[in-house]
Amino acid sequence: MPIIKSAKKRVRITEKRTAYNREWKEKIKQAIKEFEKVVEEGNVEEAEAKLREASKILDKSAGKGIIHKNKAARKKSQLTRQFNKIA
């Protein structure tokens, strides 16, 4: 355990940020899983809505620095390709 006051603060901040990042990454995974489930079922209208939702979450997380912007773009592209296969 840290002894210096500033080191203690850094530990607290790191724990908060880690929890925040983990929460957002879980949102991303959940949105992608929901989209893929709908795509598997073949429901085009619902898949389009889930694609928009997943894209929104990816963009927000990239803006917040949770994931890199190129990773967000790559994921969105992959999801769009999946959607285009059923559309």
Swiss-Prot record:
Record bears the keyword tRNA processing: no
Keyword annotations for this protein, in alphabetical order, are: Ribonucleoprotein, Ribosomal protein, RNA-binding, rRNA-binding
Q: Which domain of life is it from?
A: Bacteria
**Which GO MF terms are attached to this record?**
small ribosomal subunit rRNA binding; structural constituent of ribosome
Q: Which Pfam families match?
A: Ribosomal_S20p (PF01649)
Cellular compartments per GO CC: cytosol; small ribosomal subunit
UniProt record, GO biological process: translation
As for what it does, the entry says:
Binds directly to 16S ribosomal RNA.
Q: Its family?
A: Belongs to the bacterial ribosomal protein bS20 family.
List the protein's name.
Small ribosomal subunit protein bS20
- What is the organism of origin for this protein? Halothermothrix orenii (strain H 168 / OCM 544 / DSM 9562)
Q: What is the lineage of its organism?
A: Bacteria, Bacillati, Bacillota, Clostridia, Halanaerobiales
Q: Give the encoding gene's name.
A: rpsT
